[in-house]
Amino acid sequence: MMWYVGVVNGENTSMKGGKMSIRLEVWGENALFSRSEFKTERVTYDVMTPSAARGILEAIFWHPGMRWRIDRIHVLNPIRFDSIRRNEVGRVIDIGKIRTMAEGRGDGGAIYTAESIQQRSSTILRDVRYVIDAHFELNRAKMSSTDSAEKFQSMFM
């Protein structure tokens, strides 16, 4: 999965109601925003979730002295679904075995895919494009004396 990020019409920042706002366009070939009520099969929400939008913004710029708040998510492309099947490993390596291997003892608990492979179905979104409107709030207790909203805004850009 590949995501692309860009500013919208050159208007990617503004000051509204005393808070710094940004507008960011994101798009990609496929997307999956997992619904937690489906246990084994992965099924996507119809649109990007606010927590996914916040994750994208935090991947671009994160600081302990600020918190991203999502104001609005615009859906630009029609909502379309695809179903895919994937082979996945049905178990994970035990952390104790990894420690043993790190200490030079044992094999680390290798997983042999022929023994634990599982085929899983996923319902994903296809050809997605969103515009995220967001702002950030400051936590002065976690900021240095040189930090400011303007500084964070310029670093995001």
Question: What role is predicted for each listed range?
Answer:
Residues 3-4, 11:
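Short, positively charged and aromatic/hydrophobic N-terminal segments
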Residues 18, 67, 124-128:
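A short, structural micro-pattern
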Residues 88, 98-157:
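Internal, well-folded beta-alpha domain core
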Residues 16-40:
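N-terminal, Lys/Arg- and Ser/Thr-rich interaction peptides
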Residues 9-12, 16:
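Intrinsically disordered, low-complexity polyampholyte segments enriched for Lys and acidic residues
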Residues 38, 43-88:
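Glycine/small-residue-rich interface belts in oligomeric ring/scaffold proteins
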Residues 26-30, 77, 132-140:
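Beta-strand elements of well-folded, non-transmembrane domains
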Residues 1-2, 15:
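Methionine residue identity
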